[in-house]
From Swiss-Prot:
Protein's name according to its UniProt entry: C4-dicarboxylate transport protein
GO cellular component, one term: plasma membrane
PANTHER family linked to this entry: AEROBIC C4-DICARBOXYLATE TRANSPORT PROTEIN, PROTON/GLUTAMATE-ASPARTATE SYMPORTER
Subcellular localization, as worded in the UniProt entry: Cell inner membrane
A single GO molecular function term of this UniProt record: succinate transmembrane transporter activity
Alphabetically ordered keywords of this record: Cell inner membrane, Cell membrane, Membrane, Symport, Transmembrane, Transmembrane helix, Transport
PROSITE patterns: NA_DICARBOXYL_SYMP_1, NA_DICARBOXYL_SYMP_2
Gene3D superfamilies hit by this protein: Sodium:dicarboxylate symporter (1.10.3860.10)
Coiled-coil stretches: none
TM region(s), chain numbering: 8-28, 44-64, 76-96, 142-162, 184-206, 222-242, 326-346, 352-372
Purpose: Responsible for the transport of dicarboxylates such as succinate, fumarate, and malate from the periplasm across the membrane.
Pfam entry (one): SDF
GO BP, sorted A to Z: L-aspartate transmembrane transport
Gene name for this UniProt entry: dctA
């Protein structure tokens, strides 16, 4: 039993996170030097994200009997994303207005260090809707894979899958090659995942070592408010959606616990993307649905990021005594409905979108970003965890709506009743 526990990726990552926190707190200089360990692990994951998405989407689409099903899946997914993301934005807006974590700070925007957030403000200038849409189209196929742009790879994979499907029996050889290549890629993922504890230790030690626990205390009310909001969203909103779909949100969270710990350690939901593709398929969702919903959700269904954006924007307004009446808040909501779709599931992207939103709204000081710059890294964990759970739930819901969900398999796996007597997980 003890040997099995020590070999568990769940236990190893949890232990690594605890060691990272202690190391960063008591030896901050050493903690800061651990950053390459976390960065290196995330880079290894990013290295195989593009081929994983390509293989999953191509084999999923090419293996379908009807192409109409693909279009229906995409339409249902986008509708679900828009509804749930809007709910997340509204919940964040309501709670930050009720709690008012920034009230009474009376910060003068002129005294804030605008240079500290200049890099985010500059990047935010390129976050327009037209620029976002054009960025989905790659300049070249090789460029899409080289940059690791999820939506660009997804677009090419969908087109490739359609074309391969039209070839019929002539394309069987190509289909078999891609399917075999997919198995090799997932073998690489299993090898990389053995390094997850090292990556989590390095990332957590760096975060605590660089920013310190004192930063948490200074703006603790906003952090606590945000974490509680994310928990309520997962339990109440996603929990209700899960119950209506026929499964327990708590059993689902238990099923993806290792992925959640990896995300907790790296602060990026992208680090768990390859494993989520595999685990959602093993949960009973058809490969074509998983291949479309999960990658697309990383830009269009970021529930945690949506909550963060409304809360952070209103917090800055409260702290700087900027006017934020109902008209301004509705304007903010409309802007965020568009700008939040440009936030990829990587560390720091939410901060860039927030800068773009403040610029678009106009009357909120962009320099106010300096107020939350130090604690943004601590809130990124809750964002990433909520995003991951949200995309997992979305996949099951969409699969059910388009009748591509194996309900018995879903129930068996979540209740540890797999036919082979094992839980459906990647090896650790």
């Amino acid at each position: 039993m003890k040997t099995s526990l020590f070999k568990s990726l769940y236990f190893q990552v949890l232990t690594a996170i605890a060691i990272g926190i202690l190391l960063g707190h008591f030896y901050p200089e050493i903690g800061e030097q651990m950053k390459p360990l976390g960065d290196g692990f995330v880079k290894l994951i990013k290295m195989i994200i593009a081929p994983v998405i390509f293989c999953t989407v191509v084999t999923g689409i090419a293996g379908m009997e009807s192409m109409k099903a693909v279009g229906r899946t995409g339409a249902v997914a986008l509708l679900y994303f828009e509804i749930v993301s809007t709910i997340a934005l509204i919940i964040g807006l309501i709670i930050v207005n009720v709690v008012q974590p920034g009230a009474g700070m009376n910060v003068d925007p002129a005294t804030l260090d605008a240079k500290a957030v200049a890099v985010y403000a500059d990047q935010a200038k390129d976050q327009g809707i037209v620029a976002f849409i054009m960025d989905v189209i790659p300049a070249s196929v090789i460029g899409a894979f080289a940059s690791g742009n999820i939506l660009q790879v997804l677009l090419f994979a969908v087109l490739f899958g359609f074309a391969l499907h039209r070839l019929g029996s002539k394309g069987q050889l190509i289909f078999n090659v891609i399917e075999s290549f997919s198995q090799v890629i997932f073998g690489i993922i299993n090898m990389i995942m053995r390094l997850a504890p090292i990556g989590a230790l390095g990332a957590m030690a760096f975060t605590i070592g660089k920013y310190g626990v004192g930063t948490l205390v200074q703006l603790g009310q906003l952090i606590i408010c945000f974490y509680i909001t994310c928990i309520l969203f997962v339990v109440l909103v996603l929990g209700s959606i899960a119950k209506a779909t026929g499964f327990s949100i708590f059993k689902f969270i238990r099923y993806i616990r290792e992925e959640l710990l990896i995300v907790l350690g790296t602060s990026s939901s992208e680090s768990a993307l390859p494993r989520m593709l595999d685990k959602m398929e093993k949960l009973g969702c058809r490969k074509s649905v998983v291949g479309l919903v999960i990658p697309t959700g990383y830009s269009f269904n970021l529930d945690g990021t949506s909550i963060y954006l409304t809360m952070a924007a209103v917090f800055i307004a409260q702290a700087t005594n900027s006017q934020m009446d109902i008209v301004h808040q509705i304007t903010l909501l409309i802007v965020l409905l568009l700008s939040s779709k440009g936030a990829a599931g990587v560390t720091g992207s939410g901060f860039i979108v927030l800068a773009a939103t403040l610029s678009a709204v106009g009357h909120l000081p962009v320099a106010g970003l300096a107020l939350i710059l130090g604690i943004d890294r601590f809130m990124s964990e809750a964002r990433a965890l909520t995003n991951l759970v949200g995309n997992g739930v979305a996949t099951i819901v969409v699969a059910k709506w388009v009748k591509e969900l194996d309900h018995k398999k879903l129930d068996d796996v979540l209740n540890n009743r797999a036919p082979d007597g094992k839980t459906h997980e990647l090896s650790s």
